[in-house]
Amino acid sequence: LPIWIKQALIRDKRYPNLFLLPSAQTRDKTSVSPEQMKKLIEQLRDDFDYILIDCPAGIERGFYNAIAGADRALIVTTPEVSAIRDADRITGLLEASHIKNINLIINRIRFDMVRRGDMMSIEDIVDILSLDLIGVIPDDENVVVAANQGESLTGYHTPAGKAYENICRRIMGEDVPLACYPRRKSFFFRVADYLIHR
């Protein structure tokens, strides 16, 4: 690796094989081009088994920079109509950029609301987006607690912590079955399906 990349990498105190490459706080996203981002990822590939790129919200320069060097995408959405529409749009842009290996993560789902029909079910979301599901993260206050304490959620014996661990195992190629979740077609499914497929 070039010396400037080595100097920019921050090693995690708890996980010696985990590094973070933060973006510059003094520059905006237009300071880096998609071509430069692609070159950076190529330089990192030989030294790392997995490179996760956190994509900014919105579909602007930051989005195209983030996907420039990607060979796989994990779309994280929540069970809300507006979020599902955004995820559908992102899927189309990824496919247009020739990223075909796209998986879905559903975040902050509340099974009590799904049972009452007040929230789209996992089945609803997968039906609308037609993506392979790689994980479901239940709404869990421990996520907020861990984030505020600067701690990793893995190692917490919580539903969300277990969900993150299972997603990681699936990314690494393990066959980890998805749990059985409540299924119920909600009013929101019909609304989202109409808005996306009209």
What are the residue ranges of the model-derived segments?
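Electropositive phosphate-/nucleotide-binding environments in soluble metabolic enzymes
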Residues: 3, 31-34, 84, 119, ...
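P-loop/Walker-type NTP enzyme "switch/lid" segment
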Residues: 1-46, 147-149, 154
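Proline-rich low-complexity regions
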Residues: 22, 79, 138, 152-153, ...
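Exposed alpha-helical structural elements
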Residues: 4, 8, 36, 121-124, ...
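Generic secondary-structure signature for well-ordered alpha-helical cores
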Residues: 10, 14, 50, 130-131, ...
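Conserved catalytic-core segment of NTP-binding enzymes
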Residues: 35, 39, 43-46, 50-145
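NTP-binding/hydrolysis catalytic cores, primarily Walker-type P-loop NTPases
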Residues: 150-198
